[in-house]
């Protein structure tokens, strides 16, 4: 085994509860950084990475403007983006919205959904299909519905732990 100087080891996990405690002892990982869920401006920057001006876009609209529209749709707190209600350990209920569970991976998935839909439409019509506000809105809606529907089948305690949230006792979904 050869000796190495000035080596930096970086580890990442979205399941801190699954990391062996021996790895977390003092002197093993000197700096721990928690990266939370992206806020609206951070989401726009993430989407900008996947939705670029070199894609076929709606006339007169640039990719950054589409990214902003997509992010503002996701981060809306209207009934349209209400996933469920959750009961905290203290018994209080509060609304959970799509914005509360969004992640970089989810943002990428939404853009991928829109791209896939555009490719399918291009194949069907034989024409280039531009990435438009309605196309992106449909992708957000698909992600929202899939996330909302999955809430009915989860274990609340495990779900809150996996999603890095305060413990919750119950989840009440819309009928």
Language-model regions, residue ranges each:
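Alpha4-beta5-alpha5 switch/output surface of CheY-like receiver
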Residues: 18-20
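Conserved C-terminal "switch" segment of AAA+ ATPases
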Residues: 4-8, 22, 31, 36-107, ...
